[in-house]
From Swiss-Prot:
Topology in membrane: Multi-pass membrane protein
Keyword Transmembrane in annotation: yes
Species, as recorded: Cyanidioschyzon merolae (strain NIES-3377 / 10D)
Name of the protein: Tic20 family protein Ycf60
Keywords: Chloroplast, Membrane, Plastid, Transmembrane, Transmembrane helix
Cellular-component GO terms for this entry: chloroplast membrane
One matching Pfam family: TIC20
Superkingdom of origin organism: Eukaryota
Subcellular localization(s) per the UniProt record: Plastid, Chloroplast membrane
Family the UniProt entry places it in: Belongs to the Tic20 family.
Membrane-spanning segments: 3-23, 47-66, 81-101, 118-138, 141-161
Length: 197
């Protein structure tokens, strides 16, 4: 009983924070407008790469974490894409390696911010994939208990929070400051090769 009440309390807090951030984003966009440092195409490319960790997260824990209207929204918006992604897991693997060598390592000439965001999206994808695979390797009895539910909830919240924050920073044309993940992404793009002048 207390777990259900605590879950609803956490959901209300997350929704309040989300609404507050949404209002702040709308105010900031209306005040400043979008910065011209990144083009719309570059931003869309970054948004597309942040979809990869979302698909991976939804594959591992989406239906188990979501319920009610969120599950209906999930089925209408991402459900078919997640089914294709989970049916052919080699697609995510191929996208990961192709984008790493083409964009992050500098075969294609793109701006450093784009390389940073693509690298960060790939790192979040890799972490989500590893943690999700480890959780799926646990016995079913553990996953059905409170420990498994808590682990899936934490994976979902951390992945979605990171992706939402990073997408907000892409929208503003800025770099993110996620602990450890941003530092690893900076290390990947600091060599200066493949940078668009």
């Amino acid at each position: 009983m207390w777990i259900i009440i605590a879950s609803y309390g956490v959901l209300i807090i997350v929704l309040a924070i989300g609404i507050g951030v949404g209002v702040g984003v709308i105010r900031k966009v209306l005040k400043k407008g979008m910065k011209a440092e990144m083009t719309i195409g570059e931003r869309m490319l970054c948004f597309g790469y942040y979809l990869l960790p979302v698909l991976e997260c939804m594959t591992h824990c989406g239906p188990d974490v979501l319920n009610g209207w969120m599950k209906g929204l999930y089925k209408r918006s991402l459900g078919d894409l997640v089914v294709v992604y989970s049916t052919y897991p080699i697609l995510g693997f191929m996208i990961f390696f192709m984008s790493y060598f083409l964009l992050v390592r500098g075969i294609l000439q793109v701006r450093k911010k784009v390389r940073f965001h693509v690298s960060q999206a790939l790192i979040i994808y890799l972490l989500t994939s590893i943690i999700g695979s480890l959780l799926n390797a646990l016995p079913e009895m553990i996953l059905m208990g409170w420990f498994g539910s808590t682990c899936l909830d934490i994976l979902f919240i951390l992945t979605m929070g990171s992706v939402i924050y990073a997408s907000y920073q892409v929208w503003n044309g800025e770099l993110t400051r996620l602990p450890l993940i941003s530092e690893a992404a900076k290390l990947q793009v600091q060599d200066g090769e493949g940078e668009k002048k």
